[in-house]
């Protein structure tokens, strides 16, 4: 197959669903990978402190472990760890592997203040020596056949140590690196600095995955062109536009790109709510997750605002079920 941009033979592109704490849990991973287009997804981070987690904790955060490390659609799922104590992280990684995990990712990018306050996530970008120590320790203790990867931002306050941190990850023994093209201080404010991903890609000898501000097919083409990466991770854009990965795969496969409409999205919404109820029917989780998702999709679909307004004050699951079914009928007539 020929690349549409370069007219050269096309290299295989990988699309990965990002780990997003409190947003892309196992239910959202299940739904989005069913919709299609993903080659891999990464779990929400499992926080590592002073204890070694039991099997029940691993399955709580990454139930895919019990399904051969795959979502129900068959998409591989990687276990992500967050922490700063190399020995405890290694001990927990070994336990995760003992329970069935077959790939480990390390979080050096989470910008949440509460996480950073406890020396986790992006705060470690101030200490590339510690990053190297963590990666090297885990690589040394994990079985050789277990891939070890990492995700980082461009820095904490600024980008002055971005290349140093990336090299620490590569030299520590990671076999892959995902780069979110902002610093912690920049949060999610545009723009994402895709050109910095290329700088990092050119500085390390491991594959780099590009991440940041991919909300459309054109964004995907842009980040891939500027970064030079053949692997792209989708974050908020995947939730706001549930068919984004599917569109990208249609484009990469040379076929027509089909834009979804809200009639199709309404089916996914109802399916998502049922999956949430299956997971936790007796608390606020299903309603909270539904409203969270609709609140995000309002940016892309005007009809999402209409549906959000209908369910916003409803607290009964059966009433929400009826509203979703009625809305889906309206969308398909």
Swiss-Prot record:
Coiled-coil regions listed in the entry: none
Reaction(s) this enzyme catalyzes, per UniProt: 5,6-dihydrouridine(16) in tRNA + NADP(+) = uridine(16) in tRNA + NADPH + H(+); 5,6-dihydrouridine(16) in tRNA + NAD(+) = uridine(16) in tRNA + NADH + H(+)
Keyword Transmembrane helix listed: no
Lineage: superkingdom: Bacteria
Keyword Ligase applies: no
GO molecular function: flavin adenine dinucleotide binding; FMN binding; tRNA binding; tRNA-dihydrouridine16 synthase activity
EC number: 1.3.1.-
CDD domains (UniProt xref): DUS_like_FMN
Signal peptide: none
Annotated positions for site Interacts with tRNA: 47, 107, 188, 289, 291, 312
UniProt enzyme class: oxidoreductase
Name of protein: tRNA-dihydrouridine(16) synthase
């Amino acid at each position: 197959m020929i690349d549409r941009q370069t007219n050269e033979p096309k290299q295989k592109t990988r699309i990965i669903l990002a780990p997003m704490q409190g947003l892309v849990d196992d239910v959202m991973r299940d739904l989005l990978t069913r919709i299609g287009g993903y080659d891999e997804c990464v779990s929400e981070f499992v926080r590592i402190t002073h204890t070694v987690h039991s099997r029940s904790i691993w399955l709580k955060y990454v139930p895919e472990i019990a399904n051969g490390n795959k979502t129900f659609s068959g998409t591989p799922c990687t276990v992500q760890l967050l922490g700063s104590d190399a020995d405890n992280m290694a001990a927990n990684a070994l336990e995760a592997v003992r329970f069935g995990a077959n790939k480990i990712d390390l979080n050096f990018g989470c910008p949440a203040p509460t996480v950073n306050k406890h020396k986790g996530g992006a705060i470690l970008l101030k200490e590339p020596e510690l990053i190297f120590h963590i990666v090297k320790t885990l690589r040394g203790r994990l079985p050789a056949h277990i891939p070890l990867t990492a995700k980082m931002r461009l820095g904490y306050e600024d980008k002055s140590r971005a290349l140093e941190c990336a090299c620490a990850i590569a030299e520590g023994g990671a076999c892959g690196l995902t780069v979110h093209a902002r610093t912690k201080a920049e949060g999610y404010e545009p723009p994402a600095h895709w050109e910095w991903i290329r700088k990092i890609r050119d500085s390390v000898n491991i594959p780099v995955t590009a991440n940041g501000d991919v909300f459309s097919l054109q964004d995907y083409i842009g980040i891939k062109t500027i970064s030079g990466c053949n692997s792209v991770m989708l974050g908020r854009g995947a939730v706001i536009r549930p068919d984004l990965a599917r569109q990208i795969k249609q484009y990469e496969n040379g076929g027509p790109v089909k834009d979804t409409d809200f009639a199709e999205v309404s089916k996914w919404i109802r399916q998502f709510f049922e999956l949430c109820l299956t997971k936790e029917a007796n608390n606020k989780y299903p309603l909270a997750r539904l409203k969270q998702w609709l609140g995000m999709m309002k940016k892309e679909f005007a009809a999402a605002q209409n549906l959000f307004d209908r369910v916003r004050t409803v607290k009964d699951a059966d009433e929400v079920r009826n509203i979703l079914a009625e809305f889906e009928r309206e969308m398909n007539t």
